[in-house]
Amino acid sequence: MKTIVRKVALVGATALLATVGYPTSAGAVELTCGATITQSTTLTADLGPCPDYGLHIGANNITLNLNGFRIFGTNEPRDGAGVWMVGRSGVTVTNGIIEFFDAGVAIEGGGGNTVSNMTLQHNIGGLRSFYGDGVAILSSVNNLVTNSTMRNNGPFSGVGLYSLVDGDHPRATTGTSTGNQIIGNVVTDNVAARAGGPVTSTDNDGIRIEPETHGNLISGNIVRNNGLDGIALFAGSSNNIITNNTVEGHGMYRTSVRRGNGIILFNRGTGNVVENNLVRGNADNGIVVQGPVGANAGATNNTIRFNLSFGNSVRPPLNPNPGGPFGGPTFDLQDRNVDCDNNVWFGNRYRTAFPACTTTGGAPI
């Protein structure tokens, strides 16, 4: 059951919808859940519980400074996003906590926004929810997510990049999410399953790059103990750079089809670079490049170099026999294309690898 909205006082240059602003003798205003801010705003107290979105961003080039406070939902499905912006640019959301929504921050369309020094936690979408992530970037470009913690969000990801097409979403701008930078975050324990199901059915990723999402940078993140894969590049996602991340402890929950990998490149992706990552202690493969699926080509013309991948294959594979896109044994390094099919593997260190082309220029440890 949804609960009553709490008001919060804000200071600084703040412009609100006329129906929600209430001047006070101190010169500040009170802001209710669901309000739209159109000037830079600093919180002076917590805001919530909010039953339907926290705050809407209604102008470009403004800053929402949570000032160490939190915006929180009701911990029920369909609470929307804690901070929601559509078609905005130059917005900064910083310095606080957002929890108990369907997404912590949702960026739809627009670009050039920043999420920094935030804790996004316990944001769980449900049936018919629009989101299921700590941060969701939907058909938006050149955004920066940095120095933040994404913990126990889902059921999709800690950070999700989505390139929407017509019919994917009832509101958001369609198009490719490109030029986004996910840098220096801690993305951990995002394990929730869909529709409130058991964690044994989770397909929740740490960082999720959905199909046909190109040209993004994932760098310097600690990605740990998420439900399925640590960093997943979905089908047709190309020219992304995955570098200098620590990726460990994934895939320990799911008990059907497959467990989870440290870093996975799904089929049809090309031109991706996976380099200088530490990948260890994952249930299935450390780093795996998927081969053909039906009529679709495998992931080809990718570069996987100078990674340290060891101590993976922690759990027995669910499909130990070869056959199908996920069948067969698992390794620290694995390419499921025949003879690696124009993928360049070079200078990696590993304990187990298959086939031999994954070991070029590298060395076992």
Regions found by a protein language model. Give the residues of each.
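Secretory targeting and sorting signals
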Residues: M1-A28
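Right-handed parallel beta-helix/beta-spiral solenoid domain characteristic of secreted/periplasmic
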Residues: V29-E30, T42-P51, T63-D102, I124
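Post-signal peptide N-terminal regions of Sec-secreted extracellular proteins
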Residues: V29-T32, T36-T38, G294, P355-I365
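Short, T/G/N/S-enriched strand-turn elements that build extracellular solenoid repeat scaffolds
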Residues: T32-T36, P51-I57
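Extracellular beta-strand/beta-solenoid scaffold signature
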Residues: P49-G54, E76-W84, F100-I107, G126-L138, ...
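Small-residue (G/S/T/A) turn/hinge positions that recur once per unit in extracellular repeat modules
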Residues: A59-I62, F69, R88-S89, G110, ...
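Acidic, glycine- and Ser/Thr-rich low-complexity intrinsically disordered tracts
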Residues: N302-T303, L308-I365
